[in-house]
């Protein structure tokens, strides 16, 4: 009801996440098909906005997390295990190609992105089909991590930098 009433309001008071966070922003105002009207924002805690913006619009994946989940799902889903291994191999290749940290071109992670998409689809199917799985929470947590990564990946433009860290 609050969202519907907002269409008739001259002012909306809300947390800044509803304006800036890519997962919870008010899509009816700021998403595709939203109004073209100009907005004025009065932002509380604005001194934290730059750092929070970096957090909201950044995503990272760790190779070790793929391996850890692979061990967890080993007994429960062979297809998911294989997809986790494929992602791990792509990340291992990136890791081996860098000493310390290096900027990565978008094309260099294309194959990884495809496998992440397949993995996310498999996880979604598993989660829908296995409400009572003993590994559900671990899969769900990793699924949200992948989902956030995919959301940020879809927003990539010249303002983003992708980097890989070895070690």
Task: Briefly describe each language-model feature range.
Residues 1-18:
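Conserved P-loop NTPase mechanochemical-coupling segment
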Residues 6-10, 23-41, 45-167:
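Conserved coupling segment at the C-terminus of the helicase ATP-binding
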